[in-house]
Every structure is written in C-alpha cells, then in structure tokens.
Amino acid sequence: HDDYKKYHHAIVWGGGNVAMDCARSLVRIIDDVKVVYRRSEEEMPANKVEIRDARKEGVVFNFLENIKESLRDENGQVVGAKVVKMELGEPDESGRRSTHEVADSEYVEKADLIVMAIGQKVNFKPLHDSLEKKEGHVSSLENVYIMGDAYTGPATIGSAVLEGKALAKEIVQSFEE
C-alpha cells in the first residue's frame, strides 16, 4: 500500500504467523524490516516455512530480544525502539520457556514504523457458553455466525480473509433460500 512507502525502517514485534504475514508484506515495500522476538527461533510459534520464506525475502530476525518502549521525536513520530536482550529460563505453566531480561543490555534500534503483532489470548468462554456451533458457521442464535479465531482457534490473517469470503457466500445463500 502506498501509505507505507514513506517508511524506511520497520520493526515487527512478535513471533507468530501474523508477525510473519506483516513482515513479509512490509519487506516488499520497505528495505529494512526486522522481526523482534523475545524467545529463540526454536520457540518461535510461526510456521517454519513462513520463517524461511521471510528470511529469503530479506526480513532480518532479532531473536532473544524484546521491545521496552517506542521512541518518538518532538513531533510524536516514531524514530526507534528501546530494545533489551533476553535469556531463556525454565518452562512456565504452559510449557514454554520463560524469558528474562539480560542486565545492562538495552540498545536503540532505528525504526520509523513499529508493528505490534504479539499474541493475545481472547476469552471466548462467555461466547461459547451461549452459542452452539451448528452446520458451517451458523450458530444456535438466529443471524449470529461464528468465524475467525472463535471458529478455528488462532490462525493466520490469510486464512481469516478466506474464511470471511466463504462466510459471506454462506450468508448470501441463506437469504436466497
């Protein structure tokens, strides 16, 4: 998109499939794209083919690093990120290895665009308690459809777009019946 052509140094913060989608899209229009991820490549949840392809396209990976804050100029424009090096600890409750900041390891990474693509868990329990999934994306409530993460669990942006198109056709067909 033309709006992004004004940027020169992008940081994508995260290690999942959405981060890979963002980084791979940005590297096609911005020369300097880095992915900052707080764990090692082995712990990275993104699809390994996506990581490999992002690397081939020119995305640089900064593993075992985390963003502490974005830095802005006097006009409020992003000019960089304060980054800290991380080290792996023992596994947490989820089984993933915990991370800890390395003392005195902060540095500034130049950036005029920071994309936050860190995982967030959404609590769908209240929704699931009141909805029963019927055929396709139809729920037990009239004119209420289920899609996206509520339907499939966490997935990629690309799969959400395809699913949205399929659901739109499904809704149109229901009106035609």
Question: Could you say what each language-model-derived stretch is?
Answer:
Residues 58-67:
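A conserved beta-strand/loop element that lines the FAD pocket in flavoprotein oxidoreductases
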Residues 1-48, 107, 113, 117-132, ...:
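Rossmann-like dinucleotide/flavin-binding elements
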Residues 67-70, 137-138:
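A structural signal for short hydrophobic beta-strand segments in well-ordered beta-sheet cores
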Residues 7, 67, 76-78:
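A broad structural signal for short, well-ordered beta-strand segments within beta-sheet-rich domains
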Residues 72-106:
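Conserved beta-strand-loop-beta-strand element in the redox core of flavoprotein oxidoreductases
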